[in-house]
Amino acid sequence: MMWIQKNPFLGLLLCSFLAFFQSTYAEVGKLVCFYDAQSFVREGPAQMSLAELEPALQFCNFLVYGYAGIDAVTYKIKSLDPSLTNDRQHYRHITALRKKYPHVRFLLSVGGDRDVNSEGVADSDKYLRLLEQSEHRKSFQASVLAELNNNGFDGIDLAWQFPKNRPKLQQGVFKRVWGSLRGWFSSSSVDEKSEEHREQFATLLEELQSDLRRGGQLLTVSMLPHVSAELFIDVPKVLSNVDFVNLGTYDFQTPERDPKVADLPTPLYAMYDRDPSHNVQYQVQYWMNQTSEISVHKLHVGVTSYGRAWNMTRNSGITGYPPIPAANGAAPPGRQTVTPGLLSWPEICDLLQQQPQDREVPHLRKVGDPTKRFGIYAYRAADDQGENGLWVGYEDPLTAAIKAGFVHAQGLGGVAFHDLSMDDFRGQCAGEKFPILRSIKFKL
């Protein structure tokens, strides 16, 4: 290395480059694992104990505990299940796992559409009110610091409950494109003060980041599906004040939003004659276009471990090829999730393995995606009485790995995995625990 001694400037330049390369490289290939704490108190096969959670932690860089909420009067962070988090000390039981898994950072997430009003609907109003007043933000910030320190969390994740875009009817591609463009310039349909809230959210992050940095704690943001980044997120300011952002690149179509049309819930690329924004690539590209190449490693792509399911009717046809017309809302709940229109990976795997002669649960026909661009689905056409029809679009280990490969190819930070409790955490399908999580990790 005599040339370094002769030219110290080049040596300094090389050291700077290596430091940049190492810091950037260290930030890619991350796996953010979301943990629905309600899985701990569910009954039956959906219940996931801490012992069943632990095998996943060897693959996770971050564990995000979901979810806390906000008090509508004091604007302080609050538990959404005090009997679990306080009486049973569940927060501390989770963060105590750090002793066995020191490589994992434990975050507490706020919002996530779990903070609901008296009607059981995600409450966005108080999240906007908190942003609007400086004293409300200060109350929230102080309570966050106390909650993290009291329970041993390494940081806070803001899955902020902004108003969601309204569902759009299926229509031709020209109308889809025009509707999307028109939506960029009009915010009155979901929030007349979106510009103010956009700036106020950036201010909240700047203030909160300043407090958290003193204690070496993390600040992250999780975008929820159907929340418009164009309306509510100042991308450069947000990325400059957070450690990373988990993109809501899933649930583009759901039975709740689109009860009459079944379609692939999470295509990787744009599909013909669909909303051009309803795919992973579009969402990622929007964020990449708004920031510098240096900050791209802060973006994590959301990947799920479940499927969205609709009832097929006689008028839905027999081919199963999406989009499926004349669907009849959410399919019946599974034995594990017990939620209409939502099936976990082990529930889907079980349905796929049923034999045709099984009268209780007739088998589904799986249709793959040789293009590796849009996703897979399985279906059962309605019978002569118009009953027992089912259509489900979902992720499996292979499609999740394809998305992880996309993340790697784009130079993004990693994957945000939703949710550990929906993966096959008992290995009941193929004998391997957390197969989707594993497939993502190995591809990253």
Swiss-Prot record:
Range of residues in the leader sequence: 1-26
S-S pairs: 33-60, 349-429
GO cellular component, one term: extracellular region
Gene Ontology MF term list: chitin binding; imaginal disc growth factor receptor binding
InterPro entries: Chitinase_II/V-like_cat, Chitinase_insertion_sf, Glyco_hydro18_cat, Glycoside_hydrolase_SF, Glycosyl_Hydrlase_18, IDGF
Entry comment on modification after translation: Glycosylated.
Coiled coil: none
Family: Belongs to the glycosyl hydrolase 18 family. IDGF subfamily.
Note: Lacks the typical Glu active site in position 161 that is replaced by a Gln residue, preventing the hydrolase activity. Its precise function remains unclear.
PANTHER family: CHITINASE, CHITINASE-LIKE PROTEIN IDGF1-RELATED
Protein name from the UniProt record: Chitinase-like protein Idgf5
Lineage of the organism: Eukaryota, Metazoa, Ecdysozoa, Arthropoda, Hexapoda
